[in-house]
Amino acid sequence: MIGDGKLLASAAWDAQSLNELKAKAGQDPAANIRPVARQVEGMFVQMMLKSMREALPKDGLFSSDQTRLYTSMYDQQIAQQMTAGKGLGLADMMVKQMTSGQTMPADDAPQVPLKFSLETVNSYQNQALTQLVRKAIPKTPDSSDAPLSGDSKDFLARLSLPARLASEQSGVPHHLILAQAALESGWGQRQILRENGEPSYNVFGVKATASWKGPVTEITTTEYENGEAKKVKAKFRVYSSYLEALSDYVALLTRNPRYAAVTTAATAEQGAVALQNAGYATDPNYARKLTSMIQQLKAMSEKVSKTYSANLDNLF
């Protein structure tokens, strides 16, 4: 049986590891159901990442064959990390489905290889997995069920998986991370710009205090004094990417003692209240606005989860 460690150490579910898994499954199919499920879960994450990347602009200052290669390698690493340990739960659901109502074969029973091959994988990629990814694109939870704008989809595609990884490392609820980025930047459509009009990638509205040694941009923003909104000039931090912005945001919350209640919050809603109590923003309704965003995101996640469950039969 292939151990999880060896499976995760392979080069992002490549053809060699698939063929090795096929051989092992032929020798002991029942014992290798879980590795097969883990492999499919890993491929699904990669397909989801690929679909998200395809939603992003293809041309840009930093777009090249090299950056696309590094991005692909980074996505492979994300897929490995996302499916390590408990993973996303998709593998467990597949194992439960495949073993439901079945008994383990006797030692002398004829061995039938599990129906899993590279050709089957390619078929999944072109059909069922792609359909699942498309159905997983978030939509607003209101009664009209209207899809989010393209900009909002791009915004979520950029931040969803990195936010979950950041949550696992920092303790900050991932729905809170996404909700705050969405609120501060208007789902990525009202981002803080640099003086030359280029994006600052500062989707969390982090100001440039005296301790900040990096580039800054000065804009007019809204602050509240005694509950009254006022327009003021303020300096904000400038980053080179969303990942850098996310990393700095997490560092800000985890290294500053006043945000301790945020990193230990049991729920995203509690984290939102802790953020306001810690003085992250001057808006007296900040926690309420964040909670509204969090509820929208959770409703989206629930829809995605139901989509996965309803379509598992199509995987095998």
From Swiss-Prot:
Keyword Cell wall biogenesis/degradation carried by entry: yes
Keywords, ordered alphabetically: Bacterial flagellum biogenesis, Cell wall biogenesis/degradation, Glycosidase, Hydrolase, Periplasm
Database matches in InterPro entries: Flagellar_prot_FlgJ_N, FlgJ, Glycosyl_Hydrolase_73, MGlyc_endo_b_GlcNAc-like_dom
One annotated Gene Ontology cellular component of this protein: periplasmic space
Main location, first listed in the record: periplasm
Enzyme class of the recorded protein, top EC level: hydrolase
Further facts: Exported via the flagellum-specific export pathway.
Protein name according to UniProt: Peptidoglycan hydrolase FlgJ
Organism: Salmonella typhimurium (strain LT2 / SGSC1412 / ATCC 700720)
Name of the coding gene: flgJ
